[in-house]
Amino acid sequence: MAALIISQFGGPDGELAASQRYLSQRYSMPYKEVVGVLNDIGTEELAHMEMVSAIVHQLTRNLTPEQIKASGFDTYFVDHTVGLWPQAASGMPFTSVCFQSKGDAITDLTENMAADGTTV
């Protein structure tokens, strides 16, 4: 279960990408009201990272070697033991290609709506 949930931490649609998306885009936003909203949302996404991290920690803190292997968590465990590392469930490490910051208000806001599943 933790191997799947960790994708919400550092996967392509995870909280790390979301927080960086909003916090990066705020600097080129021409409207101060929107800058504040992007800052607030980015900060909220950081809080989501903390919650996901707590869930992964609770799921992994007392695993036995047998459980680690049986659950498929062994490939993660080899490199990180039970430390939190941002990656997708596939094992791909977090990369900044997961989010965009183009410097154009319409483009950035459209990307935000698409990333959050909002109807565009």
Region spans (language model):
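Non-heme di-metal
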Residues: 1-120
